[in-house]
Amino acid sequence: MLFRFSSSFLESISTHVDPKLPFISLSKGLELNTLRTMSTIIPRPVGNRRQPFVVLSGPSFAVELMNKLPTAMVVASKDNKLASSVQQLLASPNLRISTSSDVTGVEIAGALKNVLAIAAGIVEGMSLGNNCMAALVAQGCSEIRWLATKMGAKPTTLSGLSGSGDIMLTCFVNLSRNRTVGLRLGSGEKLDRIMGSMNQVAEGVSTAGAVIALAQKYKVKMPVLTAVARIIDNELTPTKAVLELMNLPQVEEV
């Protein structure tokens, strides 16, 4: 379900929703006008602040799951018993499921890794090399961690399946839609042309619009991810973005 349609869709079905029915979210994004994740979107339109909720995330391409290739994911819920129940429901010989109570960390990592994947694709499209790719992704991981922890996430979540695991998959594998968008941007294509030619959604494009607002709200410096947002908004070209990033003040690594 696309984030921009989620509230209206949930309102349309609210009278049919059992207040004890758990929602399992696979969405990885943010609602642009509110900066909310799915766990905070759902309660209002369904009219139940205590609607049971679980988020399922981690490094997983659907085609590989369908082909029964080994996969590991994480389910996060503030209700530990619910998380365990979903774990038992979904686990199989080909799918390992870990549990977490850090809903914020899992959701924020899942949303922002899509923006970082666009950045990784841009580096690939511009043929900037492996050194640049490694530095950019490392910096992007730090930016996601800085923001997520400011929002209440656990640092360990960002190094787990929903953080580092999903980031590696999305940034480095050709099946990634967001990486593909970045690769084509880095190769010189215009965003409108790219989006018009795709028959699937690249959530990182819309999520990028929330990055600058989040960075300002939580007072976090996020030069890589905000550069992607500015490229998406046609405020910056990929070439100028690289020059800006390389000319940032030399700092101590944190």
Predicted features along the sequence, with ranges:
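Conserved residues at beta->alpha junctions
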Residues: M1, G29, S77, F172, ...
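Rossmann-like NAD(P)(H) cofactor-binding subdomain of soluble oxidoreductases
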Residues: M1-K68, V86
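Generic structural signal for well-ordered, non-membrane alpha-helical segments
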Residues: S6, E31, L35, S39, ...
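Internal alpha-helical scaffold of NAD(P)-dependent oxidoreductase catalytic cores
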Residues: S8, H16, I41, P45-P52, ...
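General beta-strand structural signal in soluble alpha/beta enzymes
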Residues: S25, Q51-S57, I97-S101, G160, ...
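Alpha-helical transmembrane segments of multi-pass membrane proteins, especially transporters
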Residues: V55, A134, A138, S162, ...
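NAD(P)-dependent Rossmann-like dehydrogenase/reductase catalytic/cofactor-binding core
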Residues: A120-E124, T149-S159, G163-V254
